[in-house]
Amino acid sequence: MSQARFIAFSDGSALVNPGGPGGTGFVVLDRARPAYRFGGTRWVEDGPNAVTNNRMELRAVLEALEGLPGGEQVEVISDSRYVVDALSRWIHGWRKKGWRTASGEPVLNRDLIEALDARASALTVRYTWVRGHDGHAVNEVVDQLAQAAARGVAGPGEAEVVAALRAEAFLAGGSAAPRSSRA
């Protein structure tokens, strides 16, 4: 699915883990147009759950998948092994075991994992892991978006997002700017 119509990069951050505040960051590229959107959210609390890095990572994927048209192929790229493994490998066993881990404990973050599973059921999603802080320009931008959201400050803007997408050849260079929206 390397030619998925949508590529979604996501990252999450908790300044104090657990406890927060936390933030999410994402960039979604629509290869068919080309167009993209990006953004992030600051989380001071997360309902009855503590703000954690893993919850922010999962929430970032949810935000990235929000609004994508059903039936489309999406590649989600994350530097979180937890996200990639939870959503592509472990989820199948957890469902069979009544949302229990191999050791019999309740699955942490079940609410978000089930929400992502429901959203992904309308799409064809592939989860891909990349090493964080290893020269992946778009991954660095989503990390900066998540960190900025957690701190409650402005993060990278459109110029930085476009530069990162071009650096990794997701967008061609040239004078015509692709359509964008900041979430």
Swiss-Prot record:
Q: Which UniProt keywords apply?
A: Cytoplasm, Endonuclease, Hydrolase, Magnesium, Metal-binding, Nuclease
Cofactor(s) needed: Mg(2+)
Ranges for domain RNase H type-1: 2-151
Q: How is the cofactor bound?
A: Binds 1 Mg(2+) ion per subunit. May bind a second metal ion at a regulatory site, or after substrate binding.
Under catalytic activity, the entry for this protein gives: Endonucleolytic cleavage to 5'-phosphomonoester
Q: Which top EC class applies here?
A: hydrolase
- Entry binding sites for Mg(2+) 2: D11, D143
Top-rank lineage group of the source organism: Bacteria
Please state where this protein is localized.
Answer: Cytoplasm
Enzyme Commission number(s): 3.1.26.4
Q: What is its main location?
A: cytoplasm
Q: Name one GO molecular function term.
A: magnesium ion binding
GO BP terms: namely: DNA replication, removal of RNA primer
Give me the Gene Ontology terms describing cellular component: cytoplasm
Cite the CDD domains for this sequence: RNase_HI_prokaryote_like
Residues reported in the UniProt entry to bind Mg(2+) 1 = D11, E57, D79
Briefly, what is this protein's role?
Answer: Endonuclease that specifically degrades the RNA of RNA-DNA hybrids.
Please state which protein family the record places this protein in: Belongs to the RNase H family.
Q: Subunit comment for this entry?
A: Monomer.
Protein name from the UniProt record: Ribonuclease H
Specify the species: Anaeromyxobacter dehalogenans (strain 2CP-1 / ATCC BAA-258)
